[in-house]
Structure formats: C-alpha cells, structure tokens
C-alpha cells in the first residue's frame, strides 16, 4: 500500500496549499494490510520448535494492547486469580481425556482411590504453587490473544463472523473494563479459602480414614512411631520464612507503583529527595548539577572574576574610574554565590554595601582637621539585581568552559607523556581561550595535527582497560600522507607557518617575515615526487591543500576571521518559491520578504525580527543568509601578511602560490565561521527577548494590591467581580463573585438585567438592579472589578458605573486626616484578566471550587488579582509562559523563558516576604514559598510538611532549625538564605515572640538592631541588662514599639555605626543599617508600587486580541454586515469591534441600490479609515478603489535595505498569473464565507476553537469551493468541495461532493454532517485515555518507558499527525524488546478508518486494531 493511498482522493487537498504528498510511509503499514486479510486456522501439526516460537511471540504481545493503566498491585492480584482459574480448567480438560472405562479400570485396581481423587487433585494443585503453574499448559494460539467482551459485542460488524471461543487465557487480565459474574467471584473466594496453608501433621480429621486403620491400630502405631508432629516446628519455621518472603515481596517502593515520568513530575525520585534534604539552595543544586565535579583552583577563581567582569563591561556603560571597583564588586558577589552558597536575593538584600562604591569628599571650605560631618559621601551603585542573576549564569558558563578546557588539557598532557609532543600553539592558545568556540578551535587543531597519535592513544587505552575490539586497518588520511611524505617539504618551502601568518593577521607581537626558496615552486616540486604524488603538479596541489588546511585549523586564524565577521557581518533575507506565493502584503512576514543589508547592530535593536526570520526559514518561506561584507577587501588586506617582501620572478611565483593557498583557506573559513555566527546571533536574540519578557513581567509583579480609599498601601481589599465572558450584555447572564480580604469566596451568583431605568419615560430599572444594590450594601466591597473576552465588557463597565452613580453606592467608611468618618463612591475598574483566563478552566479551579461554573472561576481569579497580582502570577507555575509579555516571545525556547520569568518572581517574592504561618494554612500564600531565597518547590513542600509535624505554627525563625521544635525544617545554610524573607507576625502578648522576626532584618544583624533600638531609647548597659533579663532578648525592640518611639531611630548617626562595624568586625554594613532603621520604623513595609490600572491600549488589546501592529488604520480586513440601510451599513469585525460604513464609502457603483449589493450576515473586505480604540468602533470603506489599495506595512528604510527591483518583478509575475486565470473574486452569501486564501484562513482560525470553519474561494475554478477547518492548534485541513447542478457561475451548486465519496445538499449540510462530525471524532480521540499529547517521538518515548517498566506487557497509544491534517498515529510496541510501529488512523465523518476498515467510535477502533494485529501475527506464523 502506498502512502499516497492514505489520502482518499486528491480533491481532499486544496492545491492552493501546495500540500506535500505523504512523503514517508507509516512503518508497518504494508505488513498489517497484508496480514489483515489473511485467514488464520490454528495448525496443530506444526513442529515443537515452531510452537516454542509461537509461544514466545504470544508471550511478547499477550500482556498487550488492551491494558488499562492499572496500578501494579491490582495487576498482580488479577494475574494470580486468572492463573488459578486457568489451572482449574486445565485439570478439567485433562479429566475429559479419560473416558468412563478408564476411570472404572482405575477404580477396580485400587478401590481406595475412587473417593479421594478430587481431594488429591486439589492437594497437588496447592502444593505445586505458582512456580510451575504454566509448565504443562498448551500454547494458546496467538490469534486468540485479543479475544474480549468488546470484540464479541462488535465482531459482527468488522470481525470474523460466528467464530467465538470460550477462552480464559493469559490475555484475560488485559481486557478493558473487565466484569466478573457472581459465580466467578464466588469461585475466587473459594479458591482463596482453599489456598490457606494447613498444618502438615497427620492429626487432622480424616487421618484414620486416610490410613485405612481402626482407632486401636492407630494408637499402637503412634506409640511406636509418634503422632507425626515431632518435626512440625521445622515445617512451621519454613512456613514463617515463606510468609516473610511474601511480605518482603509485598513491600513496594514508589518506583514499583508509578512510572518514572510520574515520579519525576511529582518530584518524588531519589534525586528529588537528595535535593530536598541537602543543605544547599535548591536553585543552586539544580543549576550546578552538570558541573558538580568541576572544582576551581584559586587562580581559576580569580580568572573567572576577571572573565565575568570583562563580559559585563562590554554591555555596561561605566566610567573609567569605576572599572576597578566594578571588578572587585563582581569578584565579591562571585565569592558570595560560590563559596558561601548565598542566593541572589540574599546578596542583594544583605550585602548591598559590596555592590556600592562610596567615596568621601571633603566639603568645600572645610579645614584639614575637620570632623566627619564636614565630608560628603558620594555613592555609586555598581550592580543591580539583574546583574547578580547574570553573574550567576556566567558562573555556570565558566564552569562549562573550565570543564572543556580540562578535557583538552588532559588530552594534550597524554600526548606529551606518550609521544613527547610539544606544541607552542596549544600551550599559548589553550590558557588564553575565553569562549567555547576558541576552545573548540584548539581541540580541532589537536585532532588535525596529531590524528595518528590520538588513534594510537585510543588503542592503548582500550588495551589497558581490557576492551577487545577489532582493529581497523590503518588508513591514513590524505593530509597525514602529505605530512608524512616528501610533499611536506614543499609545504615548509612556503617560507611561513600557518601560526606565524595568523600572528601577522592578528597584528599581535613582532611581525613574522616570509622567506623565499631559491627555486620556483614548480622546479622544487619535482624533487618531492614519490609514490603517493607522481608528478610536480600533484605535489603542488597536495602541498597547497595541506597548507590551506593548516591555516583553516589555526586557532589564531579562526580568531581573526571570527572577530572580523562580527565587525563586518550583514544579514540578507531571500524569499523562496513557496514564500513568493504565501507571503502577500498582508502577511506578517512581508516585513522582511525583501530585506537586505541588515547590519548586526540593526539586528541587536530588533532581536525578535531576526527570530521571526529564522522561523520563516524553518517554514520554508525565506532563506536567511549571514555574510561577510566587503570580504574581497578583507582578503586583499591579508595578502601582505603571507607574502614575502622580495622582488624577483621566484618571489612572484611563490607569492602567487601563497595567495592561492590563502584563497582556498578563506573560502573554507568563511563557511565554517558563518554557521557559528548565525547560531550565536540567534542565541543572543533569544536571550535578549527573554530578558525583555522578564523586565515586563517584573513590572507587572511590582504592583501592590488595589488600595482601598483611606487605607495604607498593601491593605488587601474586599472585591466584587463581574463578567459576561464573551457573551452579550443583556442577553447572557452576568456572573459575579464576592471575595473577602482573606481570599474566601463568600457569595457568587448571576445577574441578567442591570440596566438603569428612566423615570421621566416611566422605564423601570432592570430586574436585578435592586438585588445588586442590596449585595453591595450588605457586603460593602472596596472595589468592583470587571473584565471579559470581548468589547462587550466595555458596555458592562459603563452599565455598572451608571448603577453606582445613580444609586450612590459607596465603599466602607474610613477616618480621614481630620478624624472624620467618610466614605467614597465605589470605583469600578477593568481588571487585567490574563491570569483569570488560564485559571477558569484549570484543574486548580475545579479543585478550589468544584461547583462553580467556569465564568464564576474567572470572576474569582479577577478578584484575587486585585487582592494580590503577585500571588496570582505565582500560582500559575510553569503555565506562566502562556502569558504574552513581548512580541517574539513564542520564538524563545520555553525553558529559557521560564528561567528568566522565574528569576523575576524570586526577586519580587523576596522583596515582599512570606508570612510562614499564613503559608501553612493558605495555599495561595504557600505558592510563594518555592520562590523564597534558598528554597524551591521541593524544599518548600518539605518545609510545610515539617511545620505541620511540629504543630502547624512557627513561633520564631530559629524554630525552623529545630530549636525548641521536634523536627528541623532545614539546614543552617538554607536557613541563612531564607530566614529574613520568612516573617512571623509579632504579637505583644507572646513573651517568646521576637519583634525582629516580623522584619526584613536578618538574624545575623539582630544584635545591631537591638543596639540601635537601645540607643534610640537612650538606655545604658544596666537598663538593657535589666530589660532583657526580665523580658528576653526581644525586650528592647518590643519596648521601642510599645512606646511608639520608632521615630527616634532617625536621630541616630549611622555613619559612625558603620565605621565602628568595619573597623572592629571588618563588616561593611552601611546600607544594611539603613534597612534596619527603616524596618524598626515600619516592619515589612510595602515596597511595591501602587496597583497599575490598564491603559486604553492595554484594554483594547485584552478585549480584542489586536495590537497596533495587527489592526491599524489603512488595513483591509473582513467585516460581517449586521444591518443595511440606504445611507450606511453597520457591521462587525472578527475581533468584535463595531464598524460603520458611511454613505460616501458604500460603493463606487451608484447605479445599483445598496441593498442589492449587500445583505445582512454577508462577509466583505473593508479598509479601515478611522479606529477609535477607547470606544471600540471604526469607520471603514467598501469602495473597490479603497479596498484595492491597502496601506503598505513596510517601514521607511535606508537605501539598499529593501530590494524594490525583486519586489516589483514578483508583483508583476503574480499579476500575470492572476490575469491568465481570468477569474474575478467570488463572494458567497454565507456567514462562514471569507475572501481568504489558505494562509489567511489558517491565520484567521489560529485563535479560534477546534472545529471552527472557514468557507473560501478555491483556485480550481468556479465549480469548486474550499473549506478550511481547525483540527487542532496549528493543524488545519483544507477540503476541496466539487459543486454540481449550479444555476450560474456564481451560485452555489445544489449538490456538493467531497472526495468523490460524500454528497451534501447545501453548505450547512456539509458543515454539520461532514466537518462538525469529523471535529467530534477528533474530540473523541483526544479525550480518550489512550491519547497522548505531544509528538510521535514523545509517544514512542512513552511506549519505551512503559514497556521498560512493564517488560512483559505491550502498549499502544494514539497521537496526532501534525503533517497530515485529519490523521492520527496509532503507535504500539509488543513488549520490551519489540520494535516500535505506527499505523495511520484517518478521521472520517462516520468515525475512523484504520487499514481501510471503518470503525464508528474509539471502542470499536481499539478492538479492530487488536483483531488486525492478531491476524497480522497469525499471518507471519503461517
């Protein structure tokens, strides 16, 4: 079967798509098709060997494809029950082989055996146990392994007719949804009763009968031989040992029950436990995992500090006099990170002084003996929080650098010790290499220069290690043959080495001069002829090639080219043939379709543009080329560095040869460096975009909760949130939820009509206005939040604002500056809903409030966003990458983006701090713990677990170390990192409470804080001692708070404190003292900015999904007509914006009535003339003259940056093709019709739901239509519809045919019974338990993991085929050692198609697959 046969009729694919044919056959398909049609009678006459093979094959798949993902314990119990059942049936079959005469004969020969036959049979079965229960079981045919209840139900439709077998074989425990009858369950219970071990002595009942003796004779026997229980103790010990072994078998680890991927997802692996318990910050452990074995020497540590400083100075503008302090600051931060294991937030908060350069300057006019007050301190901040994260990343990169350098050094050391190699190039360039590229250059040089020695060294190592492998015949490379032959003399005759030439090109050190030989190259070559190179021309060619390769492999020369490339690099973009047609002027890629001569500095200013270019290149629409500008000039500048200065014919001859060599080398070097430059630019652009996303995210995090009127910043408001979602106000219900300041949802419900009436016109208020007013008066919210998913939200906002205004609804009263109680009118605000959209359908929402509707969940999230944006963002976890922060964000790898966004969360969480006791009881606060300094998801969960074990309350910070607590929650190092960021509410009544535990002051600075408090209270040492003896160590600070004397700390002169600390303790604490002073006055003051209200543009983008780039004046867009009047037309854009067509812009044809041209529900193209982003309205034109001239989206460009000539040629070429077609644009009156091509249809459906449809013109002519529908995200199917029985050229045919198989009466019939039917089947497939989200490779990986964890089982799963819309892969693996296979599953309106067999639903498809596979295996056996 060919792959092309998988697509039923080419008409299914629209030729506008330029669809590729199914390039690769699905593996296993041909075999399956052949096997499916093969009869399979069981042949009992096969030889024993064949039977064994069949038994092996059966066992490989019998654990197979019908298994549900049950737990391992249930599987084991089920297998035991089924094997017992099989043994019983085996004995019954054996009994059937004996006829009545045989049984009678046995009874006559031994009458005593007639009665106990059944009992002995049972005894033997129990004694045999589970070890040999399968030994004598005949092989069941592999064609029977898939028999199941499901197959019996559906076999009449697509299976073998009337061929049912009553079998209980090993496959029975894999039947989906097994149901056991009451009789079977009763038999299972009886089996379990019988299986109980009995005493092994002869003292039980029936012993007399069994021996055939009377009681007296039995007594005599007992007297002589004992009662049979003398050794019972040994048998009992044996029983106990067996029971103990069974108990040990029953003891299961998590890894025995769950798959490795599940354990990793839940962070329950051994590695996770190690991270959890190791006393080192979690983020440090994870980041440094690859470099655990890299230990830096002191010299390397100093080198690293300089390396990082130089990297950062390239991007920072720092005054020359600050460069040295900057380098010292970087070195100190590196010491804190690496040696002390302090995380970035700790360093930034508690080691600020090392990031500030302070200089004392005397006040003008002050005398030389002036005191300290006559000096001013000028402080320069050298490093910010982002710089600290950069240093952390650079540290990891340097460790990778050192690891690679050590590997290369070890290789070179071995070469030295074994072959006495000494190479100045390696010894000079290896220590000097500062990038991975430069190290790779050295490595390439070694492998080129010493290839044969390295081969010998590998063989020697393998001999030492005892490895035996076949030695390959020694085959020297071309360059080795030259180097080891005579021809190498000609290479040396060039008069300069590759390294010396590279040194000249680098302009480093003393110039190296070139020496000319006494003979011409051709003459000298004659003397080097040998067996390898038979004439002079061959010798010259070989010598030039080797010398050119030596230049290419020279690390110095590569450095020259690389530096020059970055200085002179330019980027060009060329459209491909595919891009010529696909990228029209409305396409987002048109911005760079003809872009040329982009300097690397231009790329740096717009990194997302370069990433989009590379994305378009991946899609085959453009080709991105990075080139070396003015490369010929660069080449000319290098010639003198390799040529000799002599003037003679001989010198000219040699210089020509040298230039030839250089040309060869530069050609190779240009190609080599080009690849790395292109990739490096991509990495830099990705890093830049990710950091831009981090900056934007930081701004969104840096906002306090909405501040109620009259309250201090940081107060959590009570919120009433309302939304209609994407519904129409007045038509769909308005969902609402009221949330208290503690985050509890106290009430929720729905309103329908909140419109305000008009007394003058006797129009009453809406029926829900009174209920709304009553709710507000009863709950007294601080703010009303509104949001939604369409411009209708603006109407809801205005409606609520009007109700608040007319009914004079006010918030909670508060006391103003004049001690008067006042209340302000409630504020209605539009809330950012980016978190709420993700929350409403999430599993977390269903868990938090199972009974709420999705839109109520949405309202809850809106309210909580107003209460704490930080908590809501933190609750998203990895889903945070779903939020759009910057253009081009989706072009950055998720891991890189997530890492950057996580650092922003870490920064803000540690700025705000976490109430540890609140985190124990409140899940939203607990979501912040993983971002606390020193912690992570594993350590945070462990911390909560230990706190709960210790009673559920933390009384002071030192309790976390286990002081006065049963269990320690963390080690000292982690505690030092996180202590100041976990605060404990201070209560005066608790004598053990330390007020400083409620501040940002670190425990290491508590003594300084207490000294400052004592000095502020003017207490002497005796007063301090008396106070602390009576009330504990926190007494002084408690007294400061109790007497409300915090303002006195402002009188302290902190400069003197700082000088004393630095002088006596060598600690720089000036900035820390400022922090302590601030905390003593207002503990954990809210440092975030005020809540940020959305701007007009933000609201417009949130409610429409459009930005200034995607929707602007001058663009041509489709509009749906709502009403047609003689003087205007009302319409709507796809994004929900109201469109008005004024009379002057209706048409160019005034001879035809407007109503004859346009009708309601018709979709037409229109040009935007005016866009009102605040009111969500626009004026548009339908005139052909306007629509045909959209505003070009190309920017003003410098000369030479845009290829106008190519653009004009392409435009003319496309116009010729359009004119040769001679067709006018077709318009159909249907709400789903759009005047799109295939690309536009895909872009339009990209943001729509699965199963949404666009009807559009077809390029095949007026008797065809194209229907595009969304199969899944990024996957669209284009269906070609053939129209028959048409009234005229522009009408829709009365009969519509799809693929030559399906016929429909009209478009609605086709949409409902064809497209929507297939969409339902796609949904059914993707909701099935066997469906795997992800790629085919990911599904294969899952199958590999599953079968490794369950070696005797087989498994199968479905996944989507992204290359062929409407198809899925059925991937399967028949056991651990079997090959992976996949079969194509086609979605059809009536169900699914597998191997040309139709199946109505997923149940039938699964059973059909099992039958097909069984038949295929049977066919193989035959």
UniProtKB/Swiss-Prot annotation:
InterPro entries: HHH_9, NA-bd_OB-fold, RNaseH-like_sf, RuvA_2-like, S1_domain, SH2_dom_sf, Spt6-like_S1, Spt6_acidic_N_dom. Residues 1196-1215 have a biased composition (Basic and acidic residues). One of its GO terms (biological process) is cellular response to stress. Residues 11-29, 44-56, 66-75, 146-155 have a biased composition (Acidic residues). Residues 1114-1183 form the S1 motif domain. It is found in: Nucleus; Chromosome. GO terms for cellular component: euchromatin; pericentric heterochromatin; transcription elongation factor complex. Pfam families: HHH_7, HHH_9, HTH_44, SH2_2, SPT6_acidic, Spt6_S1, Tex_central_region, YqgF. Keywords: Chromosome, Nucleus, SH2 domain, Transcription. Its main location: nucleus. Histone H3-H4 chaperone that plays a role in maintenance of chromatin structure during RNA polymerase II transcription elongation thereby repressing transcription initiation from cryptic promoters. Mediates the reassembly of nucleosomes onto the promoters of at least a selected set of genes during repression; the nucleosome reassembly is essential for transcriptional repression. Essential for viability. This is Transcription elongation factor spt6. The lineage of its organism: Eukaryota, Fungi, Dikarya, Ascomycota, Pezizomycotina.
